[in-house]
């Protein structure tokens, strides 16, 4: 088939890029590999398509692992994300994409785990030379996973799924710091974990309860960073998470100003935010 023929060409070009140490050839091979499904006639089965993308992504991770060309992984995630857009954006309409989206969601979990493990192993094995690449990879991976969960995962399970992935990324953040003592990957994966915690919380709560929960989570995050890194500068940067409860507290401030009650939920929300900031 056309896809197999393209795959043979891609394999040859990838080997040549490794043999002669030419990253430009690797990027060309990657583009050919990810564009190949678009060149086939007719509609490609969704499971076959994402199985193919998964195989190409694993091959990309292997090539990046032996060459150190980490930007290949970022481009790989970008292409997978582009193929995912129709399944995420069209899920609320009756089409072949919406029918296949719940199945492809499982592939999204596999992709995210692969990219996460790739980043962690790179940090543990030899450290990270280009922090910007790891930060971009972590952010894109988190955004990719967030969009899939938000648009496709069952609403009644979304908070639990966000919380579970928050634990996974938090563990990745801790592992990256423990074995490298580098703050860049710690911040990158930790930021994704914090975003997922916030997403899980916002799904379940609203109003003053959400402000209180965000303030408590921000305080807990700050304490965890201080205990893990024992670095006041790192804790100072982590204090940026207080932006979210502070911004949300403005609505509680307006509600409390217009309320006749003294000891209301909005009062305790404002009190907790004020104490946490002190």
Language model: regions and residue ranges:
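Extended, compositionally biased regions that are outside compact catalytic cores
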Residues: 1-191, 196-278
């Amino acid at each position: 088939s056309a896809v197999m023929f393209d795959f043979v060409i891609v394999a040859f070009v990838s080997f040549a890029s490794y043999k002669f140490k030419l990253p430009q050839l690797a990027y060309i091979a990657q583009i050919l590999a990810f564009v190949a499904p678009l060149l086939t006639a007719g509609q490609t089965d969704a499971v076959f398509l994402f199985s193919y993308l998964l195989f190409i992504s694993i091959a990309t991770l292997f090539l990046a692992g032996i060459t150190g060309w980490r930007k290949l992984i970022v481009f790989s995630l970008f292409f997978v994300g582009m193929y995912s857009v129709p399944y995420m954006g069209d899920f609320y309409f009756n089409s072949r994409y919406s029918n296949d989206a719940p199945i492809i969601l499982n592939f999204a979990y596999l992709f995210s785990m692969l990219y996460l493990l790739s980043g962690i192993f790179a940090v543990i094995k030899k450290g990270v030379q280009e922090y910007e690449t790891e930060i971009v990879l972590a952010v894109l991976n988190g955004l990719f996973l967030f969009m899939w969960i938000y648009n496709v995962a069952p609403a009644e399970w979304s908070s639990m799924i966000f919380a579970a992935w928050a634990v996974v990324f938090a563990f990745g953040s801790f592992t990256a710091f423990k074995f490298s003592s580098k703050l860049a990957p710690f911040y990158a994966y930790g930021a994704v974990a914090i975003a997922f915690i916030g997403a899980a919380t916002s799904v379940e709560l609203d109003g003053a309860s959400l402000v209180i929960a965000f303030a408590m989570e921000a305080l807990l995050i700050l304490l965890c960073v201080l205990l893990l890194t024992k670095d006041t500068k790192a804790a100072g940067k982590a204090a940026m998470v207080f932006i979210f409860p502070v911004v949300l507290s403005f609505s509680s401030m307006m509600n409390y100003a217009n309320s006749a009650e003294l000891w209301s939920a909005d009062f305790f929300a404002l009190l907790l935010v004020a104490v946490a900031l002190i």
